[in-house]
């Protein structure tokens, strides 16, 4: 089903007009993006009340434990507006996951560099992977989604038909047993954690079908949530994944629920985020899938169109490696 943008949605309600005072009619105020306000409120809470902790990267964080946000995807797409989010990188990384790939060089070839720091020679050697080729991240997200339980060799090996294809199982269950409470996809595999350049931060997704409304919703559990850089990407990524699965199963997107464990702000992100907190959220854009796609593996970046995206400028934040 090809999604067509609609005008308004419950996540972007219009502010009430002021009472008539006999003067010229008041102009309607801009919509309020309540979903993004919840993200900003969580940032404020962490900066004001978070516990200062040292972490793996030695940068240090302000951290709280156990947070949740909810995004309504029925009439808009949750791409944050208080800073520009690089949607092409979000989409290309997700398509890389869906393809079961673990070679960061494939993303580099598309000018997407979000995995460069964790796949460099220096980083791999530091993590003890001295015999692993540059770019080979080990059995990370895509491998677990498509080949859970298979024996990992290198990023260049052919894993066709090996392991459990969790993504395919999710789609088949949505089609054939939509009320199942076990529509789950996990990237957390304790046997493979020691082989990964970086253990999965976003660990487990559960999908929920409302047959009454014909909607697909997703809840993500994320063990480690970098609110400045990672979380805006993760929101958009799992929202896009839900749209894609809904599209190939004949459903409409519903809610994306984002549940987080260690929810943190890196200390070197505090000042940039204070700048972001001074900005007023704008309405979320819409996502259009431009053609009918039958199989999840057939999506290409060119199939996605983001419309009416009017974000504030980019804010520079350094990635903690």
From Swiss-Prot:
Renumbered residue ranges of the record's region Disordered: 1-32
Modified residues (Phosphoserine): 24, 26, 210
Keyword Signal: no
MF GO annotations: thymidylate synthase activity
InterPro entries: Thymidate_synth/dCMP_Mease, Thymidate_synth/dCMP_Mease_dom, Thymidate_synth/dCMP_Mease_sf, Thymidylate_synthase, Thymidylate_synthase_AS
Binding sites annotated in the UniProt record for (6R)-5,10-methylene-5,6,7,8-tetrahydrofolate: 226, 320
Gene Ontology, cellular component aspect: cytoplasm; cytosol; mitochondrial inner membrane; mitochondrion
Annotated dUMP binding sites: 56, 181-182, 223-226, 234, 264-266
Modified residue annotations for Phosphotyrosine: 39, 208
Enzyme class: transferase
Domain of life: Eukaryota
Alphabetized Pfam families for the sequence: Thymidylat_synt
Pathway terms, separated by semicolons: Pyrimidine metabolism; dTTP biosynthesis
Active site positions: 201 (nucleophile)
Catalytic activity: dUMP + (6R)-5,10-methylene-5,6,7,8-tetrahydrofolate = 7,8-dihydrofolate + dTMP
SUPFAM superfamilies cross-referenced by the UniProt entry: Thymidylate synthase/dCMP hydroxymethylase
EC number: 2.1.1.45
Assigned keywords, A-Z: Methyltransferase, Nucleotide biosynthesis, Phosphoprotein, Transferase
Any one Gene Ontology BP term: dTMP biosynthetic process
Similarity comment text for this entry: Belongs to the thymidylate synthase family.
Protein name, as recorded: Thymidylate synthase
Gene: Ts
């Amino acid at each position: 089903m090809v999604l067509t943008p609609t005008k308004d949605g419950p996540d972007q309600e219009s502010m009430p007009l002021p009472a008539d005072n006999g003067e010229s009619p008041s102009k309607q105020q801009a919509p309020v993006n309540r979903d993004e306000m919840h993200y900003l409120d969580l940032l404020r809470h962490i900066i004001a009340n978070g516990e200062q902790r040292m972490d793996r990267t030695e940068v240090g964080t302000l951290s709280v434990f156990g947070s949740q946000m909810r995004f309504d995807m029925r009439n808009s797409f949750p791409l944050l507006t208080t800073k520009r989010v690089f949607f092409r990188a979000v989409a290309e990384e997700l398509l890389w996951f869906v393809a079961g790939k673990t070679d960061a060089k494939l993303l580099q070839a598309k000018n997407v560099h979000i995995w460069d720091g964790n796949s460099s020679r220096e980083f791999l050697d530091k993590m003890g992977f001295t015999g692993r080729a540059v770019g080979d991240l080990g059995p990370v997200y895509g491998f677990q989604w498509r080949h859970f339980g298979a024996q990992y060799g290198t990023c260049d090996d052919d894993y066709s038909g090996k392991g459990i294809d969790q993504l395919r199982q999710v789609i088949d269950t949505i089609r054939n047993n939509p009320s199942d409470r076990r529509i789950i996809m996990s990237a957390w595999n304790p046997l493979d954690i020691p082989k990964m350049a970086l253990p999965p931060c976003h660990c487990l997704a559960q999908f929920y079908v409302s047959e009454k409304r014909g909607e697909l919703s997703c809840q993500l559990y994320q063990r480690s949530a970098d609110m400045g850089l990672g979380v805006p990407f993760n929101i958009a990524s799992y929202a896009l994944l839900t749209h894609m699965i809904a599209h190939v199963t004949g459903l409409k997107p519903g809610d994306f629920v984002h549940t987080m464990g260690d929810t943190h702000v890196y200390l070197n992100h505090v000042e940039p985020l204070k700048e972001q907190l001074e900005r007023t959220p704008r309405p979320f854009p819409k996502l259009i899938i431009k053609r009918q796609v039958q199989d999840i593996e057939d999506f290409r970046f060119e199939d996605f169109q983001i419309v009416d995206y009017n974000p504030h400028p980019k804010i520079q934040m350094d990635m903690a490696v």
